[in-house]
Design a protein with these regions (language model features):
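Gly/Pro/Ser/Thr-rich low-complexity, intrinsically disordered segments predominantly at protein N-termini
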Residues: 1-150
C-alpha cells in the first residue's frame, strides 16, 4: 500500500486513462496497478497504469485474460512514491522497453519531473510539464499533470 497522497495521485492518473479508454475502447484495454503482466523475459510486473492494443488483447485466450498473461503493455506509467528509489524505477522502465513497450512515462511528483521512454530514443526528461501526450500509441490521450501533481 501507499500513503494517501500517492493513492490520490494514482487515482487521478488511472481515472484520466479510463476516461480516454471509455471513449476509445476499440483501440485496446487499460489497466491499473493491480493487473499483472508476465513479460517475455519472464519477469512479472504490474505498472501503476498500462494499456495494450486491441489486436494484442484479442490475441489472448479467455484463460490467459484471467491470469498474468505473457504480454508486455504497449504503454506503461510508473508513478514514483516516497519509498521508491528512482534508479529502481528507471531500471523497470528500461525493462519494459526491452520487452516491447512502445511508450513509457516515469512520473516523479516530488520533483515534478517526467521521464519519457520510447524504443530507439534517448530518455526525454521534462521539468514541471503541465500535460503529456499519448502520441501515436494512445491517440488523443492527454494526461493533465496538474491533477496528478496536486
Amino acid at each position: 500500500p501507499v500513503g494517501w497522497e500517492s493513492s490520490r495521485r494514482h487515482s487521478s492518473l488511472t481515472t484520466q486513462l479510463r476516461v480516454w479508454h471509455a471513449a476509445n475502447e476499440e483501440l485496446g484495454e487499460a489497466f491499473e496497478s493491480s493487473g499483472g503482466f508476465t513479460l517475455p523475459s519472464g519477469a512479472i510486473r504490474s505498472p501503476d497504469a498500462s494499456w495494450i492494443s486491441r489486436q494484442r488483447w484479442d490475441g489472448l485466450t479467455p484463460e490467459q485474460r484471467t491470469t498474468f498473461p505473457q504480454v508486455c503493455p504497449d504503454f506503461v506509467v510508473e508513478l514514483r512514491s516516497q519509498s521508491d528509489r528512482l534508479s529502481s524505477l528507471q531500471e523497470k522502465m528500461r525493462e519494459y522497453l526491452e520487452n516491447g513497450t512502445r511508450l513509457g512515462w516515469l512520473l516523479d511528483p516530488k520533483h515534478r519531473r517526467v521521464e519519457i521512454y520510447r524504443p530507439g530514443y534517448d530518455v526525454e526528461v521534462l521539468e514541471n510539464p503541465v500535460e503529456l501526450s499519448g502520441e501515436d500509441v494512445l491517440p488523443g490521450f492527454v494526461l493533465n499533470l496538474r491533477k496528478v501533481w496536486g
